[in-house]
C-alpha cells in the first residue's frame, strides 16, 4: 500500500485545491513513515518485553555500548572469555618469575663453589673473610706451591709450609713464583739418610696476615 499516494488522493478528495507538488516527493515522507512503522517491529523482535532490561523501555532508543556492557557484562565479545584472559595472565606471571629464580640459583651455586674452594686452601685464619678474587689468587698460589713440591721430587708436601700471600704484588707470574720460592725457605726439604726432621710449626708467618688485615 502506497502511503504517499493514498495520503495525496485523500487530501485531493476533500479539498478542491490541487495537491502541492512537494507532497508527491517520495523522499520526504516515504522513508520517515517506513522507519516510524518498522521501528517498533524491529525493537520487539530484538528485545521482547520479557527480556528487556528495566532501565531500557521497549519503545525507547537502543542502549549505548557502555550501558550494554554494564548490563550484560564486559566480557561479552567473542573470543575473549574471562578464563582465557586469566590463563594468559598466569603464563606471563610465571615467565617473569622464572628469571629471578634462575639468577638466584646461579648465584647460590657460585657462592657454594667458592666456599668449597676456600676450605681447600690451608692455613687460612678462621676470622679472615676472603673475597672471590683473593680466593682465586690464593688457590693459584697453592697450586703453584704443590707443583714446586712435585718438581723437587720431595716426599709428601706439607700444607703447613704454604704461606698465604694476601698482599697485592706487581710483576708477572714467573716473578711471583720466584718470590714465593724465596719465602718458602722453611718448607721441609727431602731428608737424607740418617737425618731427622726438625720438629716445630713451619706454617705461614703471622706478619703476612697482619700486613693484609692492616690494608
Curated annotation (Swiss-Prot):
The modification Phosphoserine is found at residue 109. The keyword Transcription applies. Residues 92-104 have a biased composition (Basic residues). It is found in: Nucleus, Nucleoplasm; Nucleus, Nucleolus. Pfam families: HLH. Residues 53-109, 169-202 are annotated as: Disordered. Phosphorylation by PLK4 disrupts the interaction with MDFIC and leads to translocation into the nucleoplasm, allowing dimerization and transcription factor activity. CDD domains: bHLH_TS_HAND1. GO terms for cellular component: nucleolus; nucleoplasm. GO terms for molecular function: DNA-binding transcription factor activity, RNA polymerase II-specific; protein dimerization activity; RNA polymerase II transcription regulatory region sequence-specific DNA binding. Keywords: Activator, Developmental protein, DNA-binding, Nucleus, Phosphoprotein, Transcription, Transcription regulation. Gene3D superfamilies: Helix-loop-helix DNA-binding domain. The keyword Hydrolase does not apply. Residues 65-75 have a biased composition (Low complexity). PROSITE patterns: BHLH (PS50888). Transcription factor that plays an essential role in both trophoblast giant cell differentiation and in cardiac morphogenesis. Binds the DNA sequence 5'-NRTCTG-3' (non-canonical E-box). Acts as a transcriptional repressor of SOX15. In the adult, could be required for ongoing expression of cardiac-specific genes. PANTHER family: BASIC HELIX-LOOP-HELIX TRANSCRIPTION FACTOR, TWIST, HEART- AND NEURAL CREST DERIVATIVES-EXPRESSED PROTEIN 1. This is Heart- and neural crest derivatives-expressed protein 1.
